[in-house]
Regions:
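Short, hinge-like loop/turn segments at secondary-structure boundaries
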Residues: 59-62, 101-105, 154-156, 268-269
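Internal alpha-helical scaffold of NAD(P)-dependent oxidoreductase catalytic cores
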Residues: 35, 76-149, 155, 161-199
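Generic structural signal for helix capping and beta-alpha/helix-loop junctions
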Residues: 50-52, 94, 146, 208, ...
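Rossmann-like NAD(P)(H) cofactor-binding subdomain of soluble oxidoreductases
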Residues: 2-96
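NAD(P)-dependent Rossmann-like dehydrogenase/reductase catalytic/cofactor-binding core
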Residues: 169, 177-271
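Alpha-helix N-cap/loop-to-helix initiation residues
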Residues: 24-25, 118, 227, 248
């Protein structure tokens, strides 16, 4: 396997899999251009509402851009929405030290085209990932899965950073569980206006978080280790969608304000 910290050393690729924190992607788009050829597919495995969400969505919101996840249209213009293949990353992991990834649980990477088609490129990367021992189904309604995962990221991440607490605690505590529930219900109201169908209910989603155990969310890890916190894509984007769909988000607004202040106080957020 060839590796380099300079994309120009590698040249155009068939697939470029992007798994950075959402706020880290726009600044590196210019540096990734040597990897992108005429037929390159960008597999976007980034948490939060994806920058391409309204590409080929088939509604009157077609082409809507989200400033919270793609400031200045860096990805929309630099990658191009037609190149993108969506991906929902399920494994839980921690970074105990630079260069070391500790896998906690999970091996599923759901894939999906923005228009829901089972394209040749989606099936090809699915086959390659499956051959490596991973679960990589191609979904016709990937946005549904995006929201089910976002339910957790939207609520568990900021609450864990504010508390601070691990998943097993915040999902069962009599004070924080209702906060997570209210945030999820507000998000569900937004998503359903956008045509999303949830395969599970909020209580089951929270129970699923508790079942992961004493896991420290990525936002809590970032806070503890002094890294910039992924607030805009996980929480701010849902607030932005609330404004787009004219949906009230009082609990999300409150938790977002507190989380931003906590992060600013630690020097980990400048928005």
């Amino acid at each position: 396997v060839r590796a380099s910290d300079n994309a120009a050393d590698l040249g155009p690729q068939d697939y470029v899999i992007v798994t950075l924190k959402a706020h880290s992607v726009p600044p590196v788009v210019p540096h990734m251009q040597p990897l992108i050829g005429e037929n390159t597919t960008i597999v976007s495995g980034v948490n939060g509402v994806p920058w391409w969400y309204f590409h080929k969505i088939g509604t009157d919101l077609e082409g809507t851009r989200l400033e919270t996840v793609d400031p200045g249209n860096a990805q929309w213009d630099g990658f191009g929405p037609d190149r993108v293949l969506g991906c929902v990353v399920y494994p839980a992991a921690e970074v105990p030290e630079p260069g070391v990834i500790k896998h906690i649980e999970g091996n599923r990477f759901s894939l999906g085209e923005p228009d829901g088609s089972k394209s040749e490129r989606a099936q090809a990367i699915s086959k390659a990932l499956s051959a490596a021992g991973l679960k990589a189904p191609v979904r016709p309604r990937l946005r549904d899965e995006i929201w089910v995962k976002l339910w957790g990221n939207l609520s568990f991440n900021p609450i864990s950073a504010l508390a601070p607490a691990t998943l097993d605690v915040l999902c069962t505590d009599e004070g924080t569980r209702p906060v997570a529930r209210n945030m999820m219900l507000e998000a569900q109201a937004i998503a359903e206006k956008l045509g999303v169908k949830f395969p599970i209910d909020v209580e089951r989603r929270i129970d699923g978080g508790a079942a992961v155990g004493a896991h420290r969310t990525s936002m809590l890890q970032d806070l503890d280790q002094g890294r910039p916190m992924e607030i805009d894509a996980l929480v701010g984007s849902v607030q932005e969608l609330g404004r787009v769909t004219d949906t009230p988000t009082p609990t999300i607004d409150t938790v977002l304000a507190l989380t931003k202040l906590r992060a600013r106080s630690a020097g980990l957020y400048s928005g």
